[in-house]
């Protein structure tokens, strides 16, 4: 629409989820959705005439801590309550077209502005319940597993250009970068140390839920769990 070479491919990584409550994300359309009826109800909700019946049209997908839900551009989505989500996005500041704002009002007492015209044009209507479960839910694959290390590819979808690898470690592990920048987030454990293999940068510590960047020029680096605990580090890169 805006003549860009890329779109807002993203994903939700569940940093945490309430174990005593229902936890979910909204993802993809239900089977047999009537496009015209959905648009009619969205426009009525935009005017504040009625509340949009989300669960009539959008799948409510159960999730738990450490699930990774993939969201290729054009997929209807929203995070759910009782969850803490790490959003990994190719374009975190553009291309978000809101279809409904959950009835929230602006300072003028009217529903806040949304992007319904653009949003309706960008929905991929074939991404229904079956497509969601076949392609973007539960896609984690183990790449390597030893006594002190498990390496898993958790995403992203084949249509997307960002790859995500999760390292579950109880000891030091060396990571090769394949000439691409690494953006990492500690998703389990209190802290981990990132060390240079050749002294090209000073070692630094990443704490829980913090994000750090290792430039592509580094080549290889080492992740070291601190305080003798098991950690999980999620690393995103451009593939």
List the predicted regions and their residue ranges.
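TerminUS-proximal long segments
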Residues: 204-239
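Histidine-centered metal-chelating micro-motifs
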Residues: 68-78, 94, 211-212, 216-223
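Active-site region of the double-stranded beta-helix
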Residues: 1-65, 80-190, 194-198, 203-204, ...
């Amino acid at each position: 629409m805006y003549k860009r070479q890329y779109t807002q491919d993203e994903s939700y990584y569940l940093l945490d989820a309430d174990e005593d409550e229902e936890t979910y994300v909204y993802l993809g359309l239900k089977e047999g959705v009537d496009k015209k009826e959905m648009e009619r109800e969205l426009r009525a909700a935009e005017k504040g005439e009625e509340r949009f019946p989300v669960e009539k049209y959008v799948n409510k997908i159960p999730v738990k801590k450490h699930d990774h839900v993939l969201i290729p551009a054009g997929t209807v989505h929203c995070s759910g309550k009782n969850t803490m989500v790490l959003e990994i996005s190719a374009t975190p500041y553009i291309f978000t077209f809101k279809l409904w704002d959950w009835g929230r009002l602006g300072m003028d007492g009217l529903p806040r502005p949304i992007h319904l015209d653009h949003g309706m044009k960008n929905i991929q209507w074939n991404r229904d319940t079956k497509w969601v479960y076949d392609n973007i839910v539960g896609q984690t694959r183990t790449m390597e597993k030893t006594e002190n290390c498990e390496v898993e590819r958790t995403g992203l979808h084949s249509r997307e250009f960002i790859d995500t690898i999760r390292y579950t470690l109880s000891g030091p592990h060396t990571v090769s970068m394949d000439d691409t920048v690494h953006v990492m987030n500690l998703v389990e454990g209190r802290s981990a140390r990132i060390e240079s293999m050749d002294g090209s940068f000073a070692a630094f510590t990443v704490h829980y839920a913090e994000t750090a960047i290792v430039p592509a020029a580094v080549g290889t680096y080492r992740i070291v769990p601190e305080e003798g605990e098991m950690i999980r580090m999620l690393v995103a890169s451009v593939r």
